[in-house]
A protein has these predicted regions:
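Short, small-residue-biased leader/transition segments that mark boundaries at the very start
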Residues: 4-5
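Cytosolic Rossmann-like ligand/nucleotide-binding regulatory domains
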Residues: 16-74
Length: 74
């Protein structure tokens, strides 16, 4: 992936809880792709725009590291 693009596990921001992937629209806003959701150590790669984000999940995302830092305030 090089130095520019990163695959990273991130915590879901509190303001996104109970919203759908389509509602947060990070692909359009930040050019970041959600690869999977992780809960209880298990990855769920079967996600759609209608998938709702839950409190105890994290995301596996792919994008430019600068975009990931900006989006998730890393």
């Amino acid at each position: 992936l090089g130095d520019v693009y990163k695959r990273q596990e991130v915590t879901i921001p509190p303001e996104w809880i109970d919203r759908t992937i389509g509602e947060i629209n990070i692909r359009k806003k930040y050019n970041i792709n959600i690869l999977a959701l992780k809960k209880d150590g298990k990855l769920d790669m079967n996600i759609t725009p209608d998938t709702q984000l839950c409190r105890d999940e994290s995301m596996l995302v792919l994008g430019k590291y600068a975009s990931i830092q900006k989006c998730f305030r890393l």
